[in-house]
Structure formats: C-alpha cells, structure tokens
Amino acid sequence: MILRTLLISAVAPGGEEEEVEVAVAISPLKLMTAGLICGILGTAFAWVHPLIPALAVIPVVVWGADAVRRVAGYGLGTGVPSIGFMGLGGGSVAAILAAALSGNTVPAWAAAIIGTVIGAVVGALLGVLDRRVIKMKIPVMERCSTEIVASGTLALICLMAAVAGDFTWSAVYSKVIATGLIAVLWAICAISLLHPFNACLGPSETQERTLWLGAECGSLCTVVAGLATANPVVLLAGAAAWLITFWKFWELTKRDAADVVWTGIVPKGE
C-alpha cells in the first residue's frame, strides 16, 4: 500500500513545538469525508431498512478511530480510553438533541448534520480547554478532539436510527431512550472508537492494522443493532462484516508480529 507522509506538530524536549513526519496509508481528510457521507446518508435512508444506518456506522467508527490514533500517539496510551469516552460523553448529548429536532420540520439528514456540527463544536471547546487551560502539550488536540466528538455523535446517530427504524424523535424516544438501549449504544460506540489504537499501540503499530480493527469494532456495532432489534438481516450482515474485518486484522497482525507461537495453557500458580 502506498504510504503518504502527514506533517503534524510535536513538542520537543524543551517544550517548543516542532514538525514530525507520520506515515499514513489513508489521509485523515479522506477518512473524515467517507465517514460524514456514509453516516449522513445512512441516517437519511434509515426508513428504507435499518441495515443501511447499521452498516453506515462502520466508516464513521473508522474515522473516529483514526482521530484517536493521531492524538493518542503523543503519549504512552494511558489516555486512550478516557478520550474515547469523552468523545461519546459530548456526542450523546448532541445525538439526542439531533433526534429531538428530527421530525416533520427537520428531515433526518439535516438533523444528522446539525447533531454532528454540535458535536464538533463541543469537541473543539474540549480541545481548547485541554490544551489552553489544562496545558496538555498536544498540538493536534483541538482538531482531533473535534473529530472524535463529531464522529462519536454521528456513530451514535446511525445506531439510534438503526434500532429505531427511522431517525425521528418519536421512534428514537420509544425504541432507544425509553427502553434504556441508549446506554448500550453509547458504550459500544465509545469502546469502538478507543479500542483499535489501544489494542494496537506500540512500536510496530500501523494505521492500516489499527483501522482494520476499527472496521471490526464498527461491525460489532452492526451486530449489536441486529441483536437489539432482533432483526436477522442486520444481525447476519453484521456477523459477515465482522468475520471479514477480523480475518483481515488477524492477517495484518501476523504480518507485523515478530513471530506467532502457541505457548500452551498457562500453568496454575501455587
């Protein structure tokens, strides 16, 4: 795969910022564009079949996982879970507000856009607070925080639309919020954003392997939507997507690993 070089700022030992090169297989702009288009269109056509938004969540999760990768790469990985749940903390509020707006006057696609924009604004504010007030020396904090909350918002919107069968307030409230499924969807979205880089971080980490794991996590979101709705079509499609993406991730893991050995059953300690 052809690698492109992405220039980002880094913090030098003396505290000043300097430019470093990061090799990426797919540019962040392309991932964001794909995530936005798929997520918004998936929400807009949720009324046709819940499988559409259930599958559309996958590229949205991949986009968010890449944003987590870019910002969490500045540390040792200890803040990866925190930033994933932060993204869905702000994203859940924006997603519910988008659902409340959706109905007769505001179409689903417009509500999805409004919710994503609100999520982006929340993310930008969190990024500014993190960097300017808390003094976290992460130069890409503002942009990545914006993308993480925006992608988390849109991923949650897609799953809400998939479970509800449409992205209108009446459907979302009765089938997602009143039933308590909103908590399950919130958790699976947050874990899907944070887990890929958290599992792959280290000196041999590559964007390709991390994002394939992100696609695998997104496929599990589809499976959860199928289970929540007892819809066999969504469930089988999600399971098929999971098998494909997990197989690809496993192949890349074996490629990048120094060796793959069977150690046997761990012996019981005294």
Curated annotation (Swiss-Prot):
Bilayer-crossing regions: 22-42, 45-65, 83-103, 109-129, 148-168, 177-197, 224-244
Record note on quaternary structure: The complex is composed of 8 subunits; MtrA, MtrB, MtrC, MtrD, MtrE, MtrF, MtrG and MtrH.
UniProt GO BP: methanogenesis, from carbon dioxide; methylation; one-carbon metabolic process
Family the entry assigns: Belongs to the MtrC family.
One Gene Ontology molecular-function label: tetrahydromethanopterin S-methyltransferase activity
Highest taxon of source: Archaea
A matching Pfam family: MtrC
EC code: 7.2.1.4
Catalytic activity: 5-methyl-5,6,7,8-tetrahydromethanopterin + coenzyme M + 2 Na(+)(in) = 5,6,7,8-tetrahydromethanopterin + methyl-coenzyme M + 2 Na(+)(out)
Role of this protein: Part of a complex that catalyzes the formation of methyl-coenzyme M and tetrahydromethanopterin from coenzyme M and methyl-tetrahydromethanopterin. This is an energy-conserving, sodium-ion translocating step.
Organism: Methanopyrus kandleri (strain AV19 / DSM 6324 / JCM 9639 / NBRC 100938)
Protein name: Tetrahydromethanopterin S-methyltransferase subunit C
Location in or out of the cell: Cell membrane
